Amino acid sequence: MGHMVNAIYQIDEFVNLGANSIETDVSFDDNANPEYTYRGIPCDCGRSCLKWENYNDFLKGLRSATTPGNSKYQSKLILVVFDLKTGSLYDNQASEAGKKLAKNLLKHYWNNGNNGGRAYIVLSIPDLNHYPLIKGFTDTLKQEGHPELLEKVGYDFSGNDAIGDVAKAYKKAGVSGHVWQSDGITNCLLRGLSRVKDAVANRDSGKGYINKVYYWTVDKRATTRDALDAGVDGVMTNYPDVIADVMNEAAYKNKVRLATYEDSPWVTFKK
């Protein structure tokens, strides 16, 4: 996953470096409308924190990059994580944010269900209290007559909360399946893999809530190896070419590969 891809031109940049997935920040205005693809300060070391687009413009650019037949089409780009910056919202605005997010995606990315972008979407929410965003989103797609698009949507709570607490939030949101569990910290700091291992154990137990586990932000070869050894399904990185190099090492090249569009992002990989 290419990290912090907030300008349209960066889509090609990160995919050309080897990413098959990107992460994009989404900020909201005071009325819970998704407004900009903007992170702001602070962000990862060695990166510009200030690149941005109007959210709807970014969606149109993303649609071009993920629609077969379009001149801008990038066949390798199969999944997009929207890092929803809901910290600016009151808890009681979460549902409204989900409704507006759904309408924006439906119009500007999915083209109202008419040959829109094909990438899978993960809605990544930083606060467990904002679980109503999910129901606002799913209910709106159903009300707009496009429940089939929910097959393209997954969910993530990104606040590094206890695994049991995350499970409770999903239960409240009515979610069972399509769950990616993130764990991580900015590349400026160190973080162990104990919670990643807990998430992997939940995924592999056959009775947990997690379908996939990803770790962020992974920029070094040693950290990449540690994450792969821990059994993650994906890593978020500022340097996709570094990840590609490690995956081609003798220890990994016959064990892991980049996912393609034919691989379901919602089905747990059985070893």
UniProtKB/Swiss-Prot annotation:
Q: Which Pfam families match?
A: GDPD_2 (PF13653)
Chief location: secreted
Co-factor(s): Mg(2+)
Q: Which Gene3D superfamilies match?
A: Phosphatidylinositol (PI) phosphodiesterase
What are the disulphide bonds in this sequence? 43-49, 45-188
Which tissues and organs express this gene's product?
Answer: Expressed by the venom gland.
Q: Which residues form a coiled coil?
A: none
| Active-site residue list | 3
User: In which residues is Mg(2+) bound?
Assistant: 23, 25, 83
Per the UniProt entry, the Enzyme Commission number(s) are 4.6.1.-
Catalytic activity as recorded in UniProt:
an N-(acyl)-sphingosylphosphocholine = an N-(acyl)-sphingosyl-1,3-cyclic phosphate + choline; an N-(acyl)-sphingosylphosphoethanolamine = an N-(acyl)-sphingosyl-1,3-cyclic phosphate + ethanolamine; a 1-acyl-sn-glycero-3-phosphocholine = a 1-acyl-sn-glycero-2,3-cyclic phosphate + choline; a 1-acyl-sn-glycero-3-phosphoethanolamine = a 1-acyl-sn-glycero-2,3-cyclic phosphate + ethanolamine
Signal peptide extent: none
Official protein name in the record? Dermonecrotic toxin LhSicTox-alphaIA2bv
User: What is the species listed in this Swiss-Prot or TrEMBL entry?
Assistant: Loxosceles hirsuta
